Regions:
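Acidic donor-binding loop of glycosyltransferase active sites
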Residues: 291-305, 318
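Conserved acidic donor-binding segment of nucleotide-sugar-dependent glycosyltransferases
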Residues: 333-354, 362-368
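Conserved donor-binding/catalytic core segment of Leloir-type glycosyltransferases
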Residues: 181, 221-237, 243-250, 254
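Carbohydrate-associated surface elements
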Residues: 186, 207
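Membrane-proximal helix-turn-helix segments that form the acceptor-binding/catalytic region
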Residues: 107, 120, 135-180, 189
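A charged, aromatic-enriched C-terminal amphipathic alpha-helix characteristic of glycosyltransferases
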Residues: 366-395
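Nucleotide-activated donor-binding/catalytic signature segment of Leloir-type glycosyltransferases, i.e.
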Residues: 264-288
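N-terminal subdomain of nucleotide-sugar transferases
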Residues: 1-42, 81-83, 108-111, 247
Length: 396
C-alpha cells in the first residue's frame, strides 16, 4: 500500500510530530511505501520528499494560505500525481498546510483518514480554553474567537481563525474525510458536541515503539526516591502548580522539558534543593530517569487529549499521577481493572488544586504498585503492532 502522511512539522517538536515519525517507521517496517508532506522548516529531518514541502509562511501568507490556492495546492497536487497514494493520513495540518489537502486527496481518489491531536475541528484556537477555563462558545458561534481575541496576533489572528473555521466547517470536512481517528473518547465526545457525526469517528489510542523500550526484568521493579514531570514547561501544562506543591514536600522532583516558564521557575526555586530542572532531553537521555522514578506527574490545566508521556511512563513501569481532565483519566486505573488497564497504574487529582496534588503525591509514593505488571500491561495495550492492525481496518 502507498501511504502519504501529512503534518505541518517533520521533526520531533511535539506529540503530533513524534506520532507521525513513529507511524512512518511502523508502516515502512510492514512493507508499505510511505511519503510525507510537511512545511519546509530548517529543523526538519532529511527526507527525499523535501522538494514537495511548501516554504515557511510570511505574515501575509499566514492570512491567505488557509483558504486555498498557492504553493500548498500546487506542491501537494504534484506529490499526489507523482506518488499516487492509496491512503492520505492527515495529522496537524491547519493554518500552515490547511484542510485544503483533505479536499485535494479526496478528489484525487485516495482514502482520507485524520488523526486528531487537538480540538481545532471545533475550536479555532485549538484548545477550547479561554482565560484558563474550558470554553465551548465556538461550537455554536464561530465569531466568538474574534469577540474574545482568542488567537495569537489578537484581532488579525482571530479573524484568520474565524474565516478558516467557516470555510472548512464540519459539513465540508466530513464530506472529504473517510475516518476521523481521535486517540481518546474525550476527543470524540468533544467533536460530537461540536456538531460532528459520531459515525465518522473511531477512537484509536496512541502507540509506542516497543523496540525502544528496555526488556522487562527485575530491574523494572527497582525505583528510586524521586518523581518526574516530563513535557513543555508552560502555564497550561500545570508546571507552576506542580512546583508550588513540590516545594512543600520533602520528595525530589525532576522537571524534564523546556518552555516559556522555565527561566522564571528556575529563578523562583533556585534555593529549593529538591526541585531539579533538567531542561530539554532526548528519549535516550530521559528514559533511564523516567524508568527509575516512583511516578510521573501530569498536572495539566487544559484538556490533554491522549498524552504520549503517560503511555511512555506506564510502558516503563512508572505509575502516573494525572490531572482529572480531558483524556488523561482514560489512561489511568486507580484500583482493580478497566478498559484502560488490567492493573492499577496511577492516581488522579483535581486539576489546579495544589492541596489535592500534594496529598496525591504522598499517597502515590505510599502505594505499593506492581511496576513490572504496569509495564507488561502497557506494552501489550499500546504496542505498535496492536495499533497497526487496528489502523489497517480504516485504511482499507
Amino acid at each position: 500500500m502507498k501511504i502519504l502522511l501529512a503534518n505541518k512539522f517533520y521533526y520531533r517538536r511535539g506529540g503530533d510530530c513524534i506520532y507521525m515519525l513513529n507511524l512512518e517507521k511502523l508502516l515502512k517496517a510492514h512493507g508499505h511505501e510511505v511519503a510525507v508532506f510537511a512545511m519546509d522548516y530548517p529543523e526538519n529531518l532529511d527526507t527525499p520528499w523535501k522538494k514537495y514541502f511548501p516554504k515557511n509562511m510570511s505574515k501575509l501568507m499566514a492570512f491567505t494560505r488557509p483558504f486555498g490556492d498557492g504553493e500548498v495546492k500546487s506542491k501537494f497536487l504534484q506529490l499526489l500525481n507523482d506518488f499516487k497514494p492509496d491512503v492520505v493520513h492527515l495529522n496537524n495540518i491547519h493554518t500552515q498546510l490547511s484542510p485544503l489537502i483533505a479536499k485535494l486527496a479526496h478528489e484525487y481518489g485516495a482514502k482520507v483518514v485524520w488523526t486528531l491531536h487537538d480540538t481545532k475541528l471545533v475550536c479555532p484556537c485549538y484548545t477550547c480554553m479561554r482565560n484558563g477555563k474550558w470554553c465551548e462558545e465556538c461550537f455554536t458561534d464561530k465569531l466568538a474567537v474574534v469577540k474574545h481575541r482568542c488567537m495569537p496576533g489578537s484581532i488579525p489572528g482571530a479573524i484568520v481563525g474565524y474565516l478558516e473555521a467557516k470555510k472548512w466547517n464540519k459539513e465540508v470536512l466530513q464530506k472529504y474525510v473517510d475516518w476521523f481517528l481521535p486517540p481518546s473518547k474525550f476527543m470524540l465526545d468533544t467533536c460530537v458536541k461540536g456538531g460532528y457525526s459520531p459515525e465518522k469517528f473511531k477512537v484509536l489510542c496512541n502507540f509506542i515503539d516497543v523496540t525502544k523500550l528496555p526488556e522487562l526484568s527485575s530491574k523494572t521493579q527497582v525505583k528510586e526516591d524521586y518523581y518526574v514531570y516530563l513535557g513543555r514547561v508552560n502555564e497550561v501544562k500545570g508546571v507552576r502548580t506542580l512546583c508550588k506543591a513540590a516545594a512543600q514536600l520533602d520528595k525530589k522532583l525532576i522537571v524534564i522539558g523546556d518552555g516559556e516558564l522555565l527561566p522564571e521557575l528556575k529563578e523562583t526555586y533556585k534555593n529549593c534543593s529538591h526541585i531539579e530542572f533538567k531542561g530539554q532531553m532526548q528519549w535516550e537521555e530521559f528514559m533511564p530517569i523516567l524508568q527509575k522514578a516512583r511516578m510521573m506527574v501530569l498536572p495539566a490545566e487544559w484538556s490533554e487529549n491522549n498524552p504520549l508521556t503517560v503511555i511512555e511512563s506506564q510502558s516503563l513501569g512508572t505509575p502516573v499521577l494525572g490531572a482529572n481532565i480531558g483524556g488523561i483519566p482514560e489512561l489511568i486505573v486507580e484500583g482493580g481493572k478497566s478498559a484502560a488497564a488490567m492493573v492499577p497504574n496511577g492516581m488522579t487529582f483535581t486539576s489546579g488544586d495544589v492541596e489535592d496534588l500534594k496529598d496525591k503525591i504522598e499517597k502515590t509514593f505510599a502505594h505499593d504498585f506492581d511496576y513490572q505488571a504496569i509495564a507488561k500491561d502497557a506494552i501489550e495495550r499500546y504496542s505498535s503492532e496492536a495499533y497497526y492492525h487496528k489502523l489497517m481496518e480504516y485504511y482499507k
